[in-house]
Amino acid sequence: MKIQEKMRKPMLEARYLNVENTDRYRPIIRLFYLKYEKLKYWMYQEDVFEELKEDPYFQEYTMEQCQQDLAALASWGNLLTIQDTRKVTTIEEFKNKKFRYQLSETAVEVERMVIRIENLLIEGSSLEPTLLERLRISLGRPVSYTHLTLPTN
């Protein structure tokens, strides 16, 4: 087997999966992925921030943290950026560089792989460690039984 140059280099796009702030990076990438699936490719920092703030885990999350997280993900190649100059009316606004962000194609494929791994079914007879976590999450969701009808015997 001939080992190509790119196989010996680290894959920076997968870095967000196993670093200090992965608890913030993974939801951001998942948000972009879900929007990507709905054909909404570009997002502003404010959109990302507001979506994350809807989750109780992100109640203490700040706009500065969001900006730093997006910058880190962009530096690893997960997000593509473009400066948005459509709404700029002053030189000061132009200098503040408001960006739009898009998930890179590599990040799309990494996130698809992550989702497949998260949804793996039990193949063997042993209890999968993530099964308990998935059960806990599923049991935490409210269940509606209004659509069920009882048998009349």
Question: What is the predicted role of each segment?
Answer:
Residues 107-145:
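Leucine-rich, amphipathic alpha-helical/linker segments
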Residues 50-61:
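Short helix-coil junctions and helix-kink-helix linkers
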Residues 3-39:
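Short alpha-helical segments that sit at the start of domains
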Residues 74-85:
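A short, conserved structural fragment
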Residues 146-153:
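Conserved small/polar residues in nucleotide/adenosyl-binding loops
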Residues 60-75:
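Short amphipathic alpha-helical interaction segments
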Residues 84-96:
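Short, Lys/Arg-rich nucleic-acid/phosphate-binding segment
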Residues 39-52:
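Short acidic, hydrophobic short linear motifs in intrinsically disordered regions
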